[in-house]
Regions:
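Positively charged, low-complexity intrinsically disordered leader regions
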Residues: 1-25
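Conserved beta-strand termini and adjacent loop/short-helix elements that scaffold enzyme active sites
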Residues: 6-8, 13-14, 57-59, 93-96, ...
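Conserved acidic residues
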Residues: 21, 89, 118
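Short, glycine-rich nucleotide/cofactor-binding loops
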Residues: 23-37
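Short beta-strand/turn micro-motifs composed of small residues
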Residues: 27, 58-60, 122
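A generic structural signal for short coil/turn motifs at secondary-structure boundaries
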Residues: 32, 65-68, 129-130
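Core alpha/beta nucleotide-donor-binding catalytic domains of modification enzymes
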Residues: 38-111
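Active-site cores that bind ATP or allylic diphosphates and position pyrophosphate for catalysis
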Residues: 94-99, 106-201
Length: 201
């Protein structure tokens, strides 16, 4: 995957971007680790195949920071910079505060409808709306929703922000950096555009 220099015009606040078609991926993307990179890369390839923009929708702060007190792995500036280096056409950063947390799942669906997503790529554990009322199955009632499989490390463990955070807290920085995966590895660049599954399939 070709990296490009991140530029400010790529970034939008929630409810400010409207498109006539897109491929969308949504997530906290805390740390933009190797699993996130693979997911975003797959969404970008889907967009290129369809000839429409790719959009990465993320949150500041990551929801777990507000809901569970988890310390973010990166600042929003660093996160947006890393996502921008992967090369999507647009980045939407939603301010995850008490007001956003109170929004319903239907509110979220109405918002992302403005992006006219032809395909939405998400992780299997993605939830949205107040009290996590929305899930992939609900999203699939409105959009072509595809689940990206978890990325595992060589030891077989799933790469996750929580795992990286635990490694950092234990002082195991080399292991954490390996899971973070910067720079993006060639093996992740080759992830198939068909690597996910349709919700309900």
């Amino acid at each position: 995957m070709e990296h490009r220099t991140y530029t400010q015009p790529l970034v939008h606040a929630e409810d400010t971007l409207a498109l006539s078609g897109s491929v969308l991926t949504v997530g906290a993307f805390d740390g933009v680790h190797s699993g996130h990179q693979a997911l975003i890369g797959t969404a970008m390839r889907s967009a290129r195949n369809l000839g429409i923009p790719s959009v990465v929708y993320t949150f500041d702060p990551p929801p777990k920071a507000l809901l569970c007190g988890a310390r973010p792995l990166t600042s929003v500036r660093d996160k947006v910079g890393k996502i921008g280096a992967l090369g999507p056409d647009h980045i939407v950063v939603a301010r995850f505060d008490a007001a956003y947390r109170a929004r319903t799942a239907d509110d979220f669906i109405r918002e992302i409808s403005r992006l006219a997503p032809r395909i939405i790529w998400i992780g299997a554990d993605f939830r949205f709306g107040s009290c996590k009322g929305g899930n992939p199955q609900m999203l699939a009632r409105y959009f072509d929703t595809r689940i990206f499989p978890a990325v595992c490390c060589e030891a077989g463990e799933v790469v996750s922000s929580s795992r990286i955070r635990s490694l950092r807290e234990a002082g195991r920085f080399t292991e954490a950096e390996r899971l973070e995966g910067w720079p993006v590895r060639h093996t992740l660049q080759r992830t198939s555009d068909n690597g996910g599954r349709h919700v309900g399939a």
